């Protein structure tokens, strides 16, 4: 009754796209729930906590490192997956210099929303084109190839958590005056019931402002990036599913007037070692991003990514999220039909 029968998925074959990870991770869930707004999400959480269910939050489920699906079938309690893709609004504030990203909003939609303002999101990596969510990236400090901007990070968020007494509570660290009670706060944010005077400007960060300095420390003993870096664990940032994120406040960036992509190849990895050190220590402007690609990856892309190439060339990137969703559905069906090969879409 709360979300409507259409958005409570219990049939096994209908649950599979939500129970299976992009690269790995799968397991059985009691149900998949798809709330349409913050109030529905909040009330679902209260029911799940009362019933002592395990809650796995999920948005686009495009992650390559797992976490958005069950992992095996040896959990001690029933699992409920809450998929947030219907809660996908993005609100622009401070002349589009910042955004409020709702739980299921995607980098792809944000990129398009910022275009008229000549600005772009923090993340401009490949997952943008396949529908990756904004919140998922921040919860995992994603953006490993982003040299200039570094990890996805903010100290401004609205999220739910269990307190020490095991009670569900809503934490408003968004820096916007939205009211006192949980449902008032959620309803006001959902409907944009706030004005510029309600937006608080303080020292809390909406992006990682130190990474460009850290990454230049080429002679330091510690790496510029590593898992569970305490510097990047704050509220929703780096939470990895331990809290339920309703919304994030994030910085946006001026769009570069000129961009150029360089592809460099070598049989000697020491060449790249020297290039990396020279770029980080001597360049006035850091590259937006950089990636290493092994020859095997190149060969695999050449063999298996012709469909992507054709779609981008003929239709542009707009169709890519739909293509990847179709690909996933085909592979799930093929895995259940004995005479069809696994990963049928790649053949």
Predicted regions and their residues:
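N-terminal flexible segment immediately upstream of the FAD-binding catalytic core
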Residues: 1-50, 62-100, 250, 297-304
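A common structural junction motif
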Residues: 3, 50-53, 118-121, 280-289
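General beta-strand structural signal in soluble alpha/beta enzymes
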Residues: 7-12, 34-35, 55-59, 66, ...
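Short, conserved charged micro-motifs
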Residues: 40-43, 109, 269-275
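Anion-binding (especially nucleotide phosphate/pyrophosphate-binding) glycine-rich loop
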Residues: 72-87, 92-134
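FAD-binding subdomain of flavoenzyme oxidoreductases
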Residues: 117-119, 123-271
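C-terminal substrate-recognition/cap domain of FAD-linked oxidoreductases
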Residues: 249-254, 260-347
């Amino acid at each position: 009754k709360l979300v409507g029968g259409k958005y409570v998925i219990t049939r096994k074959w209908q649950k599979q796209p939500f129970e299976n990870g992009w690269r790995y991770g799968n397991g059985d869930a009691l149900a998949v729930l798809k709330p349409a707004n913050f109030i529905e999400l909040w009330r679902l959480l209260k029911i799940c906590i009362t019933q002592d269910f395990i809650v796995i939050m999920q948005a686009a489920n495009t992650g390559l490192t797992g976490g958005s699906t069950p992992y095996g079938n040896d959990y001690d309690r029933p699992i409920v997956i809450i998929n947030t893709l219907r809660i996908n609004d993005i609100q622009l504030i401070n002349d589009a210099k910042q955004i409020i990203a709702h739980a299921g909003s995607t980098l792809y939609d944000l990129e398009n929303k910022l275009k008229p303002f000549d600005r772009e999101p923090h993340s401009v990596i490949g997952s943008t084109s396949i529908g990756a969510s904004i919140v998922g990236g921040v919860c995992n400090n994603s953006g490993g190839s982003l040299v200039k901007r570094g990890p996805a990070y903010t100290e401004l968020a609205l999220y739910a958590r269990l307190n020490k007494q095991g009670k569900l509570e809503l934490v408003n660290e968004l820096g916007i005056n939205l009211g006192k009670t949980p449902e008032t706060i959620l309803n006001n944010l959902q409907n944009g019931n706030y004005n510029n005077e309600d937006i608080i400007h303080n020292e809390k960060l909406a992006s990682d402002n130190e990474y460009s300095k850290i990454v230049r420390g080429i002679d330091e003993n510690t790496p510029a990036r590593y898992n569970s870096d305490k510097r990047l664990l704050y509220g929703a940032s780096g939470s990895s599913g331990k809290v339920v994120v309703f919304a994030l406040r994030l910085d946006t960036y001026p769009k570069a007037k000129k961009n150029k992509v360089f592809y460099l190849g070598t049989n000697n990895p020491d060449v790249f070692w020297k290039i990396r050190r020279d770029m980080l220590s001597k360049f006035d402007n850091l590259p937006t991003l950089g990636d290493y690609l092994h020859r095997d990856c190149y060969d695999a892309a050449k063999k298996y990514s012709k469909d992507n190439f054709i779609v981008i060339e003929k239709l542009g990137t707009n169709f890519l999220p739909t293509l990847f969703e179709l690909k996933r559905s085909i592979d799930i069906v093929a895995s259940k039909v004995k005479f069809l090969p696994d990963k049928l879409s790649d053949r």
